[in-house]
Amino acid sequence: MSTQHDEHDAAGATGVADQVVAAAERARAASHGLALATRAEKDAALQAMAEALLTREPEVLAANGEDVARAEANGTPPNIVDRLRLTQERVAAMAQGLRDVAALPDPVGEVLRGSTLANGLEMRQVRVPFGVVGMIYEARPNVTADAAGICLKSGNAVLLRGSSSARSSNAAIVAALRDAIAGTGLDPDVVQQVPGDSHDSVKALMRARGHVDVLIPRGGAGLIRSVVEESTVPVIETGVGNCHVYVDRAADLDKALAIVLNAKTHRTSVCNAAESLLVHADLADTFVPRVVAALQEAGVTVHGDERFQAEDGVLPATDEDYGQEYLSLDISAAVVPDLDGAIAHIRRWSSQHTEAIVTEDLAAARRFTAAVDSAAVLVNASTRFTDGGEFGFGAEIGISTQKLHARGPMGLTEMTSTKYVVTGDGHVR
């Protein structure tokens, strides 16, 4: 029996893999036409996609209701259900996001540099699409529309593999987007949902080297680690956000309190929320009681070192806490001896996403920004500002915490590569 079952599973996995490859081949064929599309053609498609989301909002929300009900019945944590849930406002924001992408400059064809060489050859380096992008992401249906829009504008076809917990929402969104794209004359296969809900489809996408040009995972640490370790397709690693706020001895404490509260509580389920608080030892008696009281009043559970534990209600912090991306109303906290102590703590525990310093000392700020090796380092500002929209990119497909190709919020230009176009007049070597 087990042999028959194993053979059935293997056959099923092979079938899913074949379906994923077939989808990738359709995406490749569609990408050739998209790479040649004008900005006007792409922008028309984006506007149509936005309108389709609004027109078909009732069916999108109905599909999302199925996903939310299933998640709640399965005991999914509230912060994950919040990511999964769509509302009229969130659908409207998705549509507006597509319109915002349409308003952005087209990166394709941009000349980065050019010159006439000594031998008379004219050389230009220009932006070009990757080709076919694979997206693997967790329970955020808005990513479906965001990724489709950014990939289309940057000339890339996209294969979308969202969480099975959002399968109904994603299917409704993709159907609306594909119909809109087809209505403008572009090939709808530039946006596809990866066939299948099982892990076999994820594995097939990760093994589709030669069919998929780049894979971008968005989600928790487990998902990202799995994709990075198992994929044969090149991966752009988007970040787990164990983000720190360090309150320096020269901080304005009113600013510091506002920044800590915003960074932790504004929206807990996102990767740029603060997860760890560091306070200079000189402020232990003045700022620690104040910030603990404010955090607790906001519903935050503080996991602290010995000094923080002197305050009522603070739980002991472990190594696991200091390395944790909570994505909830929890924060780890420690008193550090000085600026170098803060830097050392961040170097040990950071996921290299975003760190912030609060200080009025320019020298301390400069040392912190130079010494801390993260994708974004902020001075006197909340970690919540690490975002493509806030940075003026108009949109982002994720926040990269790796160093190759792209780092930080990934906008349209980060979704392109380059090629060299060289023009001669019968030149031979």
Swiss-Prot record:
It catalyses: L-glutamate 5-semialdehyde + phosphate + NADP(+) = L-glutamyl 5-phosphate + NADPH + H(+). Pfam families: Aldedh (PF00171). Pathway: Amino-acid biosynthesis; L-proline biosynthesis; L-glutamate 5-semialdehyde from L-glutamate: step 2/2. It is an enzyme of class 1 (oxidoreductase). GO terms for cellular component: cytoplasm. Its EC number is 1.2.1.41. PANTHER family: DELTA-1-PYRROLINE-5-CARBOXYLATE SYNTHASE, GLUTAMATE SEMIALDEHYDE DEHYDROGENASE. Belongs to the gamma-glutamyl phosphate reductase family. HAMAP family: ProA. This is Gamma-glutamyl phosphate reductase. It comes from Nocardioides sp. (strain ATCC BAA-499 / JS614). The gene is proA.
